[in-house]
Amino acid sequence: MAEQVTSARATAKIVRVAPRKARLVLDTIRRKSVNEAYAILKFLPNTSTEDIYKVLNSAVANAENNFSLDREDLIVKEAFANEGPTLKRFRPRAKGSASPINKRTSHLTIVVAEKEAK
């Protein structure tokens, strides 16, 4: 007796955007329909929207191709950004010293699921 699959996920690893900045965008699309999320991402000025758009596209494609779910019935069930590896750089300063610069990366995950019938 196979259980009906109602969700699909997509992940992007080591994306060159700070997790804190990615979370600002992910918080706006969480619990929205997929079409509404696309519209929001299209008009937000944040630089992380392009990477998040790609991950959302991949999650929707996984739902359609792997589980035969209808795109119109999908919502963004989960969307989160975890911390990836940090690129450590140095900025030269006065008197031969240097200050550390941390270039942060993220692991983006989006889960889409079918709307629950009321």
Swiss-Prot record:
InterPro entries noted in UniProt: Ribosomal_uL22 (IPR001063), Ribosomal_uL22_bac/chlpt-type (IPR005727), Ribosomal_uL22_bac/org-type (IPR047867), Ribosomal_uL22_CS (IPR018260), Ribosomal_uL22_sf (IPR036394)
Any GO MF annotation of the entry: structural constituent of ribosome
Signal peptide (UniProt feature, chain positions): none
Keyword entries, A-Z: Ribonucleoprotein, Ribosomal protein, RNA-binding, rRNA-binding
Record's GO cellular component terms: cytosolic large ribosomal subunit
GO biological process: translation
Oligomer status and interactors: Part of the 50S ribosomal subunit.
HAMAP family in the cross-refs: Ribosomal_uL22_B
PANTHER family for this protein: CHLOROPLAST 50S RIBOSOMAL PROTEIN L22-RELATED, LARGE RIBOSOMAL SUBUNIT PROTEIN UL22M
Similarity comment: family membership: Belongs to the universal ribosomal protein uL22 family.
Protein's recorded name: Large ribosomal subunit protein uL22
Species per Swiss-Prot/TrEMBL record: Leuconostoc mesenteroides subsp. mesenteroides (strain ATCC 8293 / DSM 20343 / BCRC 11652 / CCM 1803 / JCM 6124 / NCDO 523 / NBRC 100496 / NCIMB 8023 / NCTC 12954 / NRRL B-1118 / 37Y)
Gene: rplV
